Each structure stands twice: as structure tokens, then as C-alpha cells.
């Protein structure tokens, strides 16, 4: 049998030859045994498993919290939407009452017009049933007719005011209009000359 010292010397010699001929080549080890990974103790394995389990539990808790948060948000959103719809219905009832009584303010009319425009856009984008469309179009036509009538009344009032103002102007004797046909303001009348005017003055 070959001694350990002679084996070690032989491997050193081979390694030096390899290093001189092939720089960067891997050195040969003296033992034929495979290099095994260091064994992990059982306590370490248990510790690693516990850590993994804790991570998974934390992840599950995080996911559960996220689900709960989403559910809370959705219920809150639904509640807000329901409240908003109730407010809108109440507003519309009040506006209908005002419209029937004829006491709509400018703000309320503008709101109704805006609502009608919005709803027509929705109608165009949605594919509603015929009954719903007919109902909506009737309501819209009614609102538009009411607003047109009120604007006609306003314009007729304005016209009447203007007529009255013009009549008071023409009837008053203080304001007189001295105009001659075919003249530019500031020029003498057609039949008169400057000499005639001066002789009239003297």
C-alpha cells in the first residue's frame, strides 16, 4: 500500500505540472471520496419548517385582511350609491312638484335640462326595452315643453316691456328728432345753402 505522504507528493507534482501547462485548470485533490454537503442538524430543519409555516400563515392572514377590506369597500360603495339614488329621487319629486306648480327657479330648470341631456346620452349608449324608452321619452318631451313655454313667456314679457318703453319715448314731448331725408348728420338741408342761412340770421 502506498502511504499518505507519497500520495500527497504525487498529487502536488501533478498539480504543479498541470498549473504550468494549463493555467487555470482545477487542482486535483488527494482523496477519492466525494465531497458531501455538510449535514443539517434536525433542530435546524425544524426551525426552517417552522419559519416557512409562519410565512405561509402571515401570507394567508394578509390575503384574508385584503379580502375583508375589499368586501368593506364594496358594501360602503353600494350604500353610498343607494343613498345617492334616494337623494336623486327626492330631488326629482321636489322638482316635479315645482314644475306642476309653475315655481321652477332658473337653477332647477338648468338642472332638469342637464339631467335630460345626461339621460339621453345614457339612452343612446344603453339598449333599453321599448317600454322604458317610451316612458323616458315622454318625460323628456314634457320637461322640454315646459322649459320652452317658460322661455316663451319670458321673451314675450321682454317684448312687452320694450314696446312700452318705445311708446313712452315717442309720446314724450321732450325728445324730438330733427331729421331730414338724404342728409348726413351735420350737413345743411338739400334746398338750403350756407348764404341763405346767414341771411336768415341777420
Curated annotation (Swiss-Prot):
Subcellular location(s) of the protein: Nucleus, Nucleolus
Biased composition (Basic residues): 153-164
Compositionally biased spans, kind Polar residues: 165-174
Annotated keywords: Nucleus, Transcription, Transcription regulation
Pfam families: RRT14
Record flagged with keyword Thylakoid: no
CC annotations in GO: nucleolus
Region (Disordered): 145-202
Keyword Transcription regulation: yes
Primary location group: nucleus
Ranges of compositional bias, category Acidic residues: 193-202
Its biological purpose: Involved in ribosome biogenesis, probably through modulation of rDNA transcription.
Family affiliation: Belongs to the RRT14 family.
Name listed for the protein in its UniProt record: Regulator of rDNA transcription 14
Amino acid at each position: 500500500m502506498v502511504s499518505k505522504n507519497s500520495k500527497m507528493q504525487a498529487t502536488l507534482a501533478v498539480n504543479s505540472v498541470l498549473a504550468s501547462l494549463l493555467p487555470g485548470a482545477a487542482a486535483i485533490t488527494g482523496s477519492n471520496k466525494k465531497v458531501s454537503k455538510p449535514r443539517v442538524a434536525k433542530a435546524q430543519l425544524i426551525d426552517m419548517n417552522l419559519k416557512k409555516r409562519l410565512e405561509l400563515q402571515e401570507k394567508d392572514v394578509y390575503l384574508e385582511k385584503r379580502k375583508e377590506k375589499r368586501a368593506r369597500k364594496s358594501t360602503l360603495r353600494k350604500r353610498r350609491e343607494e343613498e345617492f339614488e334616494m337623494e336623486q329621487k327626492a330631488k326629482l319629486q321636489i322638482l316635479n312638484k315645482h314644475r306642476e306648480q309653475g315655481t321652477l327657479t332658473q337653477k332647477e330648470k338648468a338642472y332638469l335640462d342637464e339631467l335630460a341631456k345626461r339621460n339621453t346620452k345614457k339612452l343612446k349608449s344603453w339598449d333599453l326595452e321599448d317600454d322604458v324608452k317610451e316612458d323616458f321619452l315622454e318625460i323628456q318631451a314634457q320637461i322640454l315643453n315646459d322649459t320652452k313655454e317658460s322661455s316663451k313667456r319670458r321673451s314675450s314679457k321682454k317684448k312687452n316691456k320694450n314696446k312700452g318703453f318705445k311708446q313712452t319715448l315717442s309720446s314724450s314731448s321732450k325728445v324730438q328728432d330733427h331729421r331730414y331725408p338724404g342728409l348726413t348728420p351735420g350737413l345743411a338741408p338739400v334746398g338750403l345753402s350756407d348764404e341763405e342761412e346767414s341771411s336768415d340770421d341777420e
